[in-house]
């Protein structure tokens, strides 16, 4: 037995609902990921920008030490294990061996259990451990994380389907009346004062199948109805003359898949060519449609592609484990050339992660910032509790809580498509109906970043301490006003902050195209000199609603961050010098957004 010392931060929470699934085959060969220390800390000035480094510079200055890699390799070999791959820049080493040998090398005991799937139905069968790990004494301080021994699911997809009950609450006798629904505004054969009554507008008659482009039109009075991503981008005044040309959007998926037929059906319906979409397998995972997570995958690709149709997409598929998650992100960030932006719509309550997993993943996000790659992450769909089974307690979602990513919260967006104006935008909150709310709050583990120091981040609800505030930005997320997408050959409305991460990724691709810039960590540029209670340039300030423990108000808040985007104004703010076609940057209030009336296509008759 090797001389072992504890690995700090490797403790895993005990699963109270795990059930034994029989005997684990300890002779089975598996692969784990070791994360090594940096040769030097990435300077804050490099993370904050605007300067960036190349992959070669990052590897040489902030990657793993060559001597450390050699020592880990020799130590693993002495223990009967095999180093199968090494990535100096991302500081990862892949080590294979039998379960018995790996358990002995890292001081743990593994069992086989079943536990409930995260964000889905059914049970997952996986290896399981509780307590902490150890490492050979010679590697103390060199190996900072050992991932993959316990392969429990770690994240849930942050998307929500429109329910019949939710649809029936928005299209009611109070919102659709003889005064708003007339022969002049809607075809009398489809919707009339005689057909819209308390008896006809019910959860049984108003469903995702009945709320379609043929039944909901812009001529009707503005109401809470599903939209296309193109319409959302238009209401948010995404910069004219941009489409993502020359940019790459990387998308991280931990399950599910997409079909080309779904993409072709969706984009042809919008009058767009299907963008370049390439599936990239990580550690043996692959594009696997026919699973519950298909809705997540299709939503991400379709929203990003609709708002940035000329951007190339690389969709990374990995197993839903901490090992799979970090390997996918590292592969996306450290590819050559690096992507413009990485979109992540998966996460889990911050307290459910091991410290070593959070720290290792946050390190990759710091790499992204140094390389000029922006990372957009969904802030969660369960309000301030970040727990789908409870509204008590407060937690933020990780990886959205990392200070090196752009955390994306949720709103309910109602717009007048005739005038291309936002008529109402409030915090998304349907918690009382068990239908989700935008995540937000204050981190328990990440300190307050410098760029949030003056915006009024509160103390954690029920506490006297503060930390990194979540989210940074927001966008349309309520399934009632969500996004019409195609999944398994059927058009359906889907929402959740899962939609906001790719929406912002598409916007950033367009901003990068317009400015020729790599934005990296966007927050220093968008927070700038914003102070508590003040609106930020380039944003629609959301001031109504709450997500449970936190309420919206003027300026940054823990429900919608700085607000939803006012794209053209944001471009002006981020441009140096500003484009000739833009005006003085302003913070656009939600009641008076600007923008041209869009060209009308069939999909704008929603």
Residue ranges and their predicted role:
Residues 412, 456-462, 512-558, 562, ...:
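An often Trp-containing, charged/polar helix-loop segment at the C-terminal end
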Residues 395, 402-439:
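Non-catalytic alpha/beta scaffold blocks inside enzyme catalytic domains
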Residues 232-235, 239, 588-606:
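Long, low-complexity, intrinsically disordered segments
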Residues 2-85, 94, 99-184, 189, ...:
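Substrate-binding/charge-relay-adjacent region of secreted/lumenal peptidase catalytic domains
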Residues 507:
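Walker A/P-loop NTP-binding active-site region of P-loop NTPases
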Residues 90-92:
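A generic structural signal for beta-strand entry/edge sites
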Residues 1-9, 582, 595-606:
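Boundary/junction segments of secreted and surface-exposed precursor proteins
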Residues 172, 177, 215-217, 581-587, ...:
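Ser/Thr/Pro-rich low-complexity tandem-repeat tracts
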């Amino acid at each position: 037995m090797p001389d072992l010392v504890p690995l700090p931060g490797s403790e895993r929470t005990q699963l109270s609902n795990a059930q034994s699934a029989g005997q684990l085959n300890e002779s089975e060969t598996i692969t784990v990921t070791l994360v090594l220390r940096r040769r030097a800390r990435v300077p804050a000035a490099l993370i904050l920008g605007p300067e960036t480094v190349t992959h070669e510079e990052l590897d040489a200055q902030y990657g793993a030490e060559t001597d450390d890699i050699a020592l880990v390799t020799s130590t693993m070999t002495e223990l009967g294990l095999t180093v199968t791959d090494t990535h100096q820049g991302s500081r990862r080493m892949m080590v294979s061996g039998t379960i018995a040998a790996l358990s002995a090398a890292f001081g743990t005991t593994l069992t086989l259990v079943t536990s409930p799937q995260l964000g889905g139905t059914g049970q997952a069968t996986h290896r399981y451990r509780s307590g902490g790990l150890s490492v050979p004494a010679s590697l103390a301080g060199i190996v900072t994380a050992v991932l993959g021994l316990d392969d429990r699911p770690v994240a849930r997809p942050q998307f929500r389907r429109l329910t019949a009950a939710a649809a029936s609450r928005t299209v009611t006798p109070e919102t659709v009346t003889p005064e708003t629904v007339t022969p002049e505004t809607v075809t009398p054969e489809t919707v009339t004062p005689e057909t819209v009554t308390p008896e006809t507008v019910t959860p049984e008659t108003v469903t995702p199948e009945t709320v379609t482009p043929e039944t909901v039109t812009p001529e009707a009075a503005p109401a809470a109805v599903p939209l296309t991503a193109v319409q959302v981008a238009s209401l948010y005044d995404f910069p004219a003359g941009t489409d993502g040309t020359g940019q790459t959007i990387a998308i991280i998926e931990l399950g599910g898949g997409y079909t080309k037929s779904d993409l072709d059906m969706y984009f042809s319906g919008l009058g767009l060519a299907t963008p370049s979409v390439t599936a990239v397998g990580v550690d043996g995972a692959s594009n696997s449609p026919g699973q519950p997570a298909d809705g997540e995958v299709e939503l991400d690709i379709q929203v990003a592609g609709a708002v940035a149709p000329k951007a190339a997409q690389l969709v990374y598929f990995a197993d839903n484990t901490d090992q799979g998650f970090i390997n996918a992100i590292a592969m996306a960030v450290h590819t050559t050339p690096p992507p413009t932006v990485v979109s992540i719509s998966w996460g889990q309550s911050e307290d459910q992660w091991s410290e070593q997993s959070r720290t290792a993943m946050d390190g990759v996000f710091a790499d992204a910032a140094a390389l000029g790659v922006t990372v957009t992450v969904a802030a969660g769909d369960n309000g301030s509790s970040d727990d789908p089974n409870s509204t008590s307690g407060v937690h933020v979602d990780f990886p959205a809580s990392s200070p090196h990513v752009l955390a994306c919260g949720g709103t309910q967006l109602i717009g007048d498509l005739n005038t291309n104006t936002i008529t109402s935008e409030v915090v998304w909150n349907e918690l009382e109906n068990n239908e989700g709310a935008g995540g937000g709050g204050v981190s328990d583990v990440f300190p307050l970043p410098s760029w949030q120091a003056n915006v009024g981040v509160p103390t954690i609800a029920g506490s006297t301490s503060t930390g990194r505030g979540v989210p940074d930005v927001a966008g349309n997320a309520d399934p009632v006003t969500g996004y019409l997408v195609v999944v398994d050959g059927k058009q359906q409305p889907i929402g959740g902050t899962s939609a906001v991460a790719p929406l912002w990724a598409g916007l950033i691709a367009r901003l990068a195209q317009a400015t020729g810039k790599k934005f990296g960590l966007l927050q220093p540029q968008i927070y700038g000199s914003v102070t508590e209670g003040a609106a930020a340039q380039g944003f629609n300030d959301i001031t109504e609603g709450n997500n449970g423990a936190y309420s919206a108000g003027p300026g940054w808040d823990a429900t919608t961050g700085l607000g939803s985007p006012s794209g053209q104004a944001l471009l002006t703010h981020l441009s140096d010098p500003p484009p000739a076609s833009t005006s003085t940057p302003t913070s656009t209030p939600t009641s008076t957004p600007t923008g041209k009336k869009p060209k009308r296509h069939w999909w704008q008759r929603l």
